[in-house]
Regions:
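Surface-exposed loop/edge segments in extracytoplasmic proteins
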Residues: 88-94
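Short proline/glycine- and polar residue-rich coil/turn motifs
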Residues: 95-100
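A short, structured loop/turn motif at beta-sheet edges
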Residues: 62, 110-112
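Short beta-strand-plus-loop segments that form exposed binding edges in beta-rich domains
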Residues: 119-128
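Disordered, acidic Ser/Thr/Pro-rich linker "stalks" and the adjacent N-terminal cap
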Residues: 1-62, 71-78, 86, 126, ...
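Exposed aromatic-hydrophobic patches
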Residues: 57, 101-109
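Short, conserved beta-strand segments of beta-strand-rich sandwich/propeller modules, principally
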Residues: 67, 115-117
Length: 173
């Protein structure tokens, strides 16, 4: 018996990506695009001072953003105390959890906005949640996870974003 498969996928999208048209940062402006370029081999970072530990994404369209998805340098062991704003309204505040990659930060109910701002609110701290777990991979696989970042384990007022994705629920939950 041969089963015929439909031409449509077997799933339905429940979220859509809100595109960024540009970004403004507290410093290293030329690298800001690296935080939303869909490459896990690049990053944006500030210069280690609290006054420059922020980045603002201008959206390609005015839209409601329901979730910010971040991959932060040091994801396996570093917690970043952040605030997230839609335009000038605070919609998320807390410490990012350590993870094995991306963290999903659901935002408080928000209205359509033209920008999203992410600000570091204090010193990042280390966690030993994953202890001595080792990954078998080529040495470069861990470079953005603080293993090869020069003095990356010593800087606490540094905000380092590998990837930022802004999502909207197609049907709000």
């Amino acid at each position: 018996m041969v089963r015929r498969r439909d031409a449509t996928p077997s799933y339905k999208d429940i979220k859509r990506t809100i595109q960024c048209k540009s970004a403004t940062a507290g410093c290293n402006q030329q690298d800001a695009i690296r935080s939303y370029d869909d490459s896990e081999d690049t990053e944006w970072k500030n210069d280690g001072r609290m006054s420059t530990a922020w980045i603002r994404y201008e959206l390609a369209e005015k839209a409601r953003v329901d979730e910010v998805v971040l991959k932060l340098t040091g994801w396996r062991k570093r917690e970043y105390p952040l605030q997230i704003f839609t335009d000038d309204t605070l919609v998320w505040e807390g410490k990012t959890p350590v993870s094995l990659g991306y963290v999903h930060l659901p935002l408080a109910a928000s209205q359509p906005a033209g920008s999203i701002t992410i600000k570091l609110q204090g010193s990042a701290s280390d966690s030993d949640k994953y202890g001595n777990i080792k990954e078998l991979a080529a040495p470069v696989a861990n470079e953005l996870d603080l293993f090869k970042a020069k003095d990356g384990d010593k800087v606490r007022s540094e905000l380092r974003i590998v990837e930022c994705d802004l999502l909207q629920w197609i049907k709000p939950n």
